[in-house]
Amino acid sequence: MKGVLLVNLGSPKSPTPKDLKPYLEEFLMDERVIDFPKWLRTILVKGIILKTRPRRSAKAYKKIWWKEGSPLIVLSKKLRSIIEENSSIPISLSMRYGNPSIFEGLKELNEKGINEIFIVPLYPQFAMATTETINVLAEKIRKESFSHMKFTTLQPFYNNVDYIKAVSYTHLRAHETPLH
């Protein structure tokens, strides 16, 4: 049976230094985000960045945080709901960093009897720090916990004509700019 795993970047649980610290640590310790040897990345992230960044980032997150929670999580859940309403295929939502995790998303699909997973990174472009890290972690989890599953990943679509038209249309509608 087939299912879809939507994957976005992620967000801390709340806009507080306490919740930002583990989120930033998970994110910045990813070798595909900071491409340094592990020893140097550890010194940089744990020895320098995590001592000050959570407090500074919390102030920025508080400015954009919605009463419903993280805008990224809220909008990702809304996207999942819209897709579910218009599809008969089981959909699960996960985040590369934070929760719901990729493991949780795969577990949800597994519990529904899904064994063919179409992974949809919610980024149009390919980058080591986005799409690649999703694929690497998903494959690691598959090998460790869901070896019966088969994965296919949506290829980058930044140059897809329909995607460009949709983004253009959304922009024009939002700004009420007429097409010329």
Task: Give residue spans per PLM region.
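Long, hydrophobic, well-ordered secondary-structure blocks that form the structural core
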Residues: S92-K165
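Active-site micro-motifs of SAM-dependent methyltransferase domains
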Residues: S11-K13, P124, L179
